[in-house]
Curated annotation (Swiss-Prot):
Protein name as annotated: 2,3,4,5-tetrahydropyridine-2,6-dicarboxylate N-acetyltransferase
Family per record: Belongs to the transferase hexapeptide repeat family. DapH subfamily.
GO molecular function: tetrahydrodipicolinate N-acetyltransferase activity
Catalyzed reactions per annotation: (S)-2,3,4,5-tetrahydrodipicolinate + acetyl-CoA + H2O = L-2-acetamido-6-oxoheptanedioate + CoA
Amino acid sequence: MTATKMNAQEIIQFIANAEKKTSVKVTFEGQLATAVPSSVVKLGNVLFGDWKDVAPLLEGLVENQDYVVEQDARNSAVPLLDKRAINARIEPGAIIRDQVEIGDNAVIMMGSVINIGAEIGAGTMIDMGAILGGRAIVGKNSHVGAGAVLAGVIEPASAEPVRVGDNVLIGANAVVIEGVQIGSGSVVAAGAIVTQDVPENVVVAGVPARIIKEIDAQTQQKTALEDALRTL
């Protein structure tokens, strides 16, 4: 299976060297007494920027000193992914960090969490509440079920990430442990905990997960994906 495009040391250095930011949106009443620096965006009576740059402007308010601060992070090293150029369906409420790759016609459902360095292949669906940890790889035309967890590996840096092949179905609330590889065409049953590599074209189930059968025509029919859900 393919290696991740960012290895653990590269991600660690990316986070360590990134400027830590507390991004805020501030709505205020009154007139700012000082000029707005280039690091802050002002649209009407709304300011966007890092708190360390915005806070001094609020101290200079004259007249009414009313303002509301909205923030969702503190000293964050990794911003959220800019999704505007992604050719995929991404539903509201999905949390996707920067340095994530998403293939064409993938589907990212609400409540899913995708960490830095993860890679999602074309046509793959990440269902509601699923978690892809750092550097996790999912191939093409696969399905990661609701609430499933693909464990992430950023530290220790020597550990291997989860790798999921093409045309794989991972059932709801399944857990795939760090370093495990799931072969293409396989099915992981709902609630399974996968602690060892899974070969291609088998069904695994249980805690810990074990092979219970090879993929047959009936299994393929029951686990077939719906292309219509991936239409943009």
